A protein has these predicted regions:
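Short hydrophobic/Thr-rich beta-strand motif most characteristic of the beta2 strand and flanking loop
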Residues: 32-41, 47
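Charged docking surfaces used in two-component/phosphorelay signaling
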Residues: 22-30
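Positively charged, aromatic-enriched patches within helix-turn-helix-type DNA-binding elements
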Residues: 156-233
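Acidic catalytic/metal-coordinating carboxylates
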Residues: 40, 66-69
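Short, Lys/Arg-enriched segments at the junction into DNA-binding effector domains
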Residues: 7-10, 122-184, 188
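Basic, amphipathic DNA-recognition helix from helix-turn-helix-like DNA-binding domains
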Residues: 72-144
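His-Asp phosphorelay/catalytic-motif detector in bacterial-type signaling
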Residues: 7, 52-54, 78-82, 200
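Active-site beta3 strand of CheY-like receiver
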Residues: 52-57, 62
Length: 238
């Protein structure tokens, strides 16, 4: 039985394969989403000029501007719309690079639409949830470290009072770390806390997101002060 989203979330599917666009449009619409489709980066640009999206499903391999370039361009423009990238199943390097340029998650082709649906729900759950008027924030904790201030309620990271861009996936990973200070977290635990799913052996994507966070919050990412590696275990926030 379908589990519809609590409100009508808007998803844009970007893929040069008309069959995949049509399949996902019909499937995700049936699951309760509002779906728009685009065959390439130019069509996506036209869509974003007239409508917003809660999430973008973005194919990596497309003629013209590919998915990596589109993702990089959106993030450079401080567009934080969550992105799930569709990649060739055997190309681990594509998945890693996709996360490095700011994608929130990925899924290898060919895929089961139900697996994509699960990824979509997991990514959307990481968003801030609107509070009822007058209700206290369900998560108003503020974490300060060095020159940084992370507001877990608004999901804003400040450095010396200047906002630092965070993708949905990066926020989820940083939140998992700061909520467990001085507690070494295994990759399995981090995957559950930040992504809501089990860690896949040989999957380097979690390490890639940690690396992106280090570049953002560490003065020297090669010698981290806050997000340290615990060899044989995982990572710890200190």
């Amino acid at each position: 039985m379908s589990t519809s989203p609590s409100r009508t979330d808007k998803i844009i599917v970007v893929d040069d394969d008309a069959r995949i666009r049509d399949l996902l449009r019909r499937y995700l619409t049936k699951e309760g989403f509002e779906v728009s489709i685009a065959e390439d980066g130019k069509a996506l640009n036209r869509l974003l000029l007239r409508e917003s999206a809660d999430l973008i499903v973005l194919d990596l391999m497309m003629p013209g501007e590919d998915g990596l370039s589109i993702c990089r361009r959106l993030r450079a423009a401080h567009d934080r719309t969550p992105i799930i990238m569709l990649t060739a199943k055997s190309e681990d390097v594509d998945r890693i690079v996709g996360l490095e340029v700011g994608a929130d998650d990925y899924l290898g082709k060919p895929f089961n639409p139900r697996e994509l649906l699960a990824r979509i729900h997991a990514v959307l759950r990481r968003r801030p949830q609107p509070e009822a008027p007058g209700a206290p924030s369900s998560e108003n904790e503020v974490v300060n470290f060095g020159p940084f201030c992370l507001d877990l309620g608004t999901r804003v990271l400040l450095k010396n009072n200047e906002e630092q861009p965070l993708t949905t996936g990066e926020f989820a990973m940083l939140k998992a770390l700061v909520r467990h200070p001085r507690q070494p977290l295994s990759r399995e635990k981090l995957a559950l806390l930040a992504r809501g799913r089990e860690f896949e052996p040989f999957d380097r994507s979690l390490d890639v997101q940690v690396s992106r966070l280090r570049k953002l919050v560490e003065e020297d990412a090669a010698n981290p002060r806050y997000i340290q590696t615990v060899w044989g275990v995982g990572y710890v926030f200190v």
